[in-house]
Amino acid sequence: MPREIITLQVGQCGNQIGSEFWKQLCKEHGINAAGYLEEFAKPGIDRKDVFFYQSDDDHYVPRALLLDLEPRVIDSIKTSEYSGLYNQENIFVAEKGTGAGNNWANGYKQGESFYDDIFDMIDREADGSESLEGFLLTHSISGGTGSGMGSYILERLNDRFPKKIIQTYSVFPDDSSVVVQQYNSVLTLKRLIENADSTVVLDNNALHRIVGENLRIDQPTMDQTNSLVSTVMSASTTTLRYPGYMNNDLVGMLASLIPTPKCHFLITGYTPLSIDRQTESVRKTSVLDVMRRLLQPQNIMVSAPTKTGKYISILNIIQGDVDPTQIHNSLQRIREKRMATFIDWGPASIQIALSKKSPYIKSSHKVSGLMLANHTSVNHLFSHIIQQYDKVRKKQAFLANYTRESGEILQEFDIAREMLDDLVQEYKAAEQSDYINYHMNKEFNNNNNNNNGNPQYQYGTV
């Protein structure tokens, strides 16, 4: 029985990377732009039904909702060659189409006003699933719609589907001149901490660096970075779509990666990525080569000092025809060379999931790999966001845009900032051997001081 996953694409960024994701899945499953199987595609060798369903005319339709407050990106999808792929009833654009103006509070408020429209679509899609496992959300944490409306949807999803997995692919901002992105990021991260079971961190700075280095260009385009993101997304779901003996569902995949609920922010690495023909012609990919490269900082898609922190967990998804003996020998070599430093309080091991490559895509590499890792150095990314937030908050820059939407937003800022700082301390504590005791002591102190602390506050109501 399939464990279906519904994808929610929210905002400009969420729909752009979601669109690339579906193009990639169509290629890997032998599905054309209209949703029909190609003549060369063979039925029964994969599990398309995790992400697609078949309509009455037998064409494959993504289990996806396309949601935005302004029409530009969705209009481009509707006029592309893939326009016939999607269920038009699962596309929502706000009637006025003015967007959220890079304002989290505005996006949240509009999401609240469109609650019935959005969740009627979600409920219809969920009811059409035989055994729904969860939701996959693509969005940016720094804009207005992906952050604000995305936050609102996260909260309501958690309320309405408490037993379903929620995984997000969240794009973190680069160091741009958009001042308010720090406000939006802090408010969104609070919702990701509280409501997501797993968040795959997609750091714009690192994505641009990796694409630039591999393509040898100074200014990568948005399409090029989105293509990289779609590669990561498709690789991270390959064991669900081409199942083996392990990691056939999200629960199994996340169980070993996230030993403590709060530390659920995952970093990624992928190799080989080079499209330079000269490099491809001389490189010999092996399991050891792939696993070694996955641990190298230049291949990790987060701007964080991974050499100074510790791994809480690693799952390597290896694609290709691989002899299990090669896996064993590679793991032994990595241990001998001490290529990865693990926390002291958990199993110091790299989990391996073997997956088939799509038979419909030609590859010049025999072996490729994706690393999903829980690493304590991700706290540096959160610390940087806090530092940038504190600077603009001290100047009270553009705060009026937020207080205009809600008089309670300043209190919400303070709570969100405190929660993000707690997450930073949590990851730092995870580097220590007495982390379990630290966690117990913290809970004990919180219980004793409960009457003196701030009450939990949830922004907005249904």
From Swiss-Prot:
One Gene Ontology CC term in the entry: microtubule
A Pfam family reported for this protein in Swiss-Prot or TrEMBL: Tubulin_C
Protein localization: Cytoplasm, Cytoskeleton, Microtubule organizing center, Centrosome
GO terms for biological process, alphabetical: cytoplasmic microtubule organization; meiotic spindle organization; microtubule nucleation; mitotic cell cycle; mitotic sister chromatid segregation; mitotic spindle organization
Similarity remark: Belongs to the tubulin family.
GO molecular function terms attached to this record: GTP binding; microtubule nucleator activity
Primary location class: cytoplasm
Amino-acid positions noted as binding GTP in the UniProt annotation, renumbered to this chain: S142, G143, G144, T145, G146, S147, G148
Protein name (record): Tubulin gamma chain
Keyword set includes Cytoplasm: yes
Keywords: Cytoplasm, Cytoskeleton, GTP-binding, Microtubule, Nucleotide-binding
PANTHER family recorded: TUBULIN
Role according to the record: Tubulin is the major constituent of microtubules. The gamma chain is found at microtubule organizing centers (MTOC) such as the spindle poles or the centrosome, suggesting that it is involved in the minus-end nucleation of microtubule assembly.
Organism of provenance: Dictyostelium discoideum (Social amoeba)
